[in-house]
Amino acid sequence: MSLEVYGQVNEALMYWDDGKESNVYQVTNDNSRTRIGFRGKAKIDADWEAGYRIEIGVRSANSKRSNQFNAKGDGNPADIGLDLRDSYWFVKNKKFGSVSLGMQASATDQITEINQTQTKDFAKYSDVEDTGFGLLLRSAINGRLTNNAVTPTTSATSSPGDNGLTLRRLIGDGGDQPGEGERRFNLIKYESPEIAGFTASASWGEDDFWDLALRYTGEFGGFKVAAGVGYGKVTDGYYLQTKTVCAGRADAAPGVASTDQKCDQFGGSISVVHEATGLFLNAGAGVKNDDYLKKQARFATVAGVDDSQDFWAVQAGIEKKFNEFGKTTIYGEYYDYEGGANSRRTVTQSDALSPDPGAAHGWAIWGTGVEVFGAGIAQGFDKAAMVLYLSYRHVESDLTLKGLTGATSGPASGAIRNAPVEDVDLVMTGAIIKF
């Protein structure tokens, strides 16, 4: 059995401006974070082989969890340091495909972010959460941060505003785009052999989910094309086991919260590169539906509840070897997300985001929206297996709230009000080196 050691280091400086305050943090770029891995395989006979993969992620600081009070992003200590990304074995047959078992990527992992260019390592066009979306929301009315967080905490395990709304909470509550699968599942997965550029895969994992995906790679007419579509369903279980966030949970009994979930999602993406000119286009989209949201006590008696989420994103530019060092990438991008209600979060009547600070009730999240406009440049250095990059993103957010009958509980039967949020500007510059 062979052994190959591989990995990468991806560290950056991240500048942010939330409309009132700005700063620069040194972070691990979570678009493709620092990691080290071990993999190997061995032939059993002419048609069969077996192998394994173990991969460990490394974060010195977390680019998607840092906030105005916490440069490292370690409000949850598990968000920095080491984490297990892969630990599985596989058996593969040339004619019938492969089966793998253990902690690994699901069939739909990265299905909405297929990308043949250098931007996949530092500015994923559809997974915008990874660049600065741990920042707390700042009210555009009073200039204060959500959760009234104004001074550092003395706690070793939390920072002020940990219970407040961050940018990522506006994207399906967890920050992952609708339609996208995940890594770090305990699952069994089947992958078919390639037929005319197409491969199919399916996975099932605890507790419980399953998904299906179809991918294509090929070249024709001077274009390199990579594309994929996938469908996934969470049928039961606690979200910390499945890693998929459904915004609603089932009620075991009226007024009693349960950890059960049930949602399904569909997504896909395509990446096209014109080999002669280097012009490229990456595009992705996805939708998620939450079957339990309308069964929540908060929304069960309320008309007009939206239990869906959707997004689309596009990135286009040119990637070509203009100099002897390696490829240069210049691009622009746009991302748009629209989401419905959320039963996991509330805004208190005294919060900075409250539309009516004098109200006797809190607020339910009725709808969210995120728009991102971005651009960037990167330079590859082939001899060093390194890419230097600079990316910029301007983030505009929408937050709509609906009054609760109680401060933090009861049906959302009150008025619908907007909660204006300050725009955010984000700049990331750094390098990734692979080995």
Residue ranges and their predicted role:
Residues 11-17, 56-60, 105-107, 204-208, ...:
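Transmembrane beta-strands of outer-membrane beta-barrel pores
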Residues 421-435:
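Outer-membrane beta-barrel "beta-signal"
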Residues 32-36, 85-89, 184-188, 198, ...:
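Hydrophobic, lipid-facing positions within transmembrane beta-strands of outer-membrane proteins
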Residues 2-14, 24-211, 215-221:
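Outer membrane beta-barrel
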